[in-house]
Regions:
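Conserved alpha/beta-domain cores
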Residues: 1-172
């Protein structure tokens, strides 16, 4: 991990994944100084995180799993970062919530860099237009994310992601 952090040369943040962990384990992690957590299911997060966020104001919560449109309002209210913006319908819904609420959580666009049909995410060829559309709706696009194919070198996909981020002037 240290070698990768040094290689990246930027601020690197480790996100503790708390899915399927009991409340006691999460609280122990918080008391140990971990303050950035990821959950992949809105419903599980709703059962776990409201009291933690109320009692520990330095905690930051990321949604790292797919976001169904019927859970968007709940996710919008609970999560500080939504890392899985992956389609125009969801972008439109989040834009409406942004207008309604007067704020927008930090958003990462999920890019399907491997162009795998079984995975969600914006295809690389569609990304530039998708970013412009999101920005025109006043969505706060703070980053890109991908899940590289299992049988390919992850560094190639992260390199591609970085080029797309630079090309679109996304600073995170």
């Amino acid at each position: 991990i240290r070698r990768n952090i040094d290689y990246l040369g930027k601020k690197t943040e480790i996100i503790a994944i708390s899915k399927n962990h009991p409340l006691e384990a999460v609280e122990t992690a918080i008391l140990s100084g971990i303050c950035v957590f990821g959950e992949n299911r809105v419903q599980e997060a709703l059962n776990k995180w409201p009291s933690f966020k109320e009692n520990y104001e330095n905690v930051e919560l990321h949604l790292i799993g797919p976001l169904q449109t019927n859970k968007a309002r709940q996710a919008f209210e609970l999560f500080d970062v939504i890392q899985t913006l992956d389609r125009p319908k969801l972008a439109n819904l989040l834009a409406n919530l942004t207008q309604e609420r007067g704020f927008c959580p930090s958003l990462f666009i999920q890019v399907n860099t491997g162009e795998e049909p079984q995975k969600t995410g914006v295809l690389p060829k569609d990304l530039d237009i998708f970013i412009k559309d999101c920005q025109s709706m006043d969505l706060r696009i703070d980053g890109l994310m991908c899940i590289p194919p299992l049988n390919e070198e992850p560094a190639l996909h992260f390199s591609l992601l970085r080029k797309m981020q630079e090309r679109n002037n996304i600073r995170f």
